[in-house]
Swiss-Prot record:
One Pfam family of this chain: Ribosomal_L14
This protein's encoding gene: rpl14
UniProt GO BP: translation
GO cellular component: cytosolic large ribosomal subunit
Full protein name: Large ribosomal subunit protein uL14
Species name: Pyrococcus horikoshii (strain ATCC 700860 / DSM 12428 / JCM 9974 / NBRC 100139 / OT-3)
Length: 141
């Protein structure tokens, strides 16, 4: 039997940030894809129970609709990865992390960002899980 916590230093961080962004939430778009505000309409790979409203946290991919932005982007259904959330969550080292806003980056279904730059900081959990997002991020917290 493996020692307790043997794989904690390899690969993706085992931290599961608090799921604080429910269906219906509005998110700021932090890239230059053309969208400004999106509304969450679903969470990819969420398996709830008993009619529970799906919710997402940092690093999760969501399905959303564009509410504000360029005319060609508005009313489109897109996929996005959450990179910041207001609700604080705890990392394994005891540090608690929270951001000023709830923000996401629009991506393709494979996880490749549609924009070429990201405004503001990106949570380390999202940058580790989605490497292409981490590569274009200017600040990783």
């Amino acid at each position: 039997m493996a020692k307790k916590g043997a794989g904690a230093t390899r690969g993706i961080s085992p931290v599961r940030p608090t799921r604080a962004i429910p269906i219906g939430a509005y998110l700021t778009v932090a890239d230059n894809s053309g969208a400004k505000v999106i509304q969450v309409i679903g969470v990819v790979e969420y398996h709830g129970t008993r009619r529970r409203l799906a919710s997402a946290g940092v690093g999760d991919m969501v399905v959303a609709t564009v509410k504000k932005g360029r005319p060609d982007m508005r009313h489109q259904v897109v996929r996005a990865v959450i990179i910041r959330q207001r609700k604080e969550y705890r990392r394994l080292d005891g540090m608690r992390v929270k951001f000023e806003d709830n923000a996401a980056v629009i991506v393709t279904p494979e996880g490749v960002p549609r924009g070429t730059e990201i405004r503001g900081p990106v949570a380390r959990e999202a940058a580790e899980k989605w490497v292409r997002i981490g590569s274009i991020a200017s600040i990783i917290v």
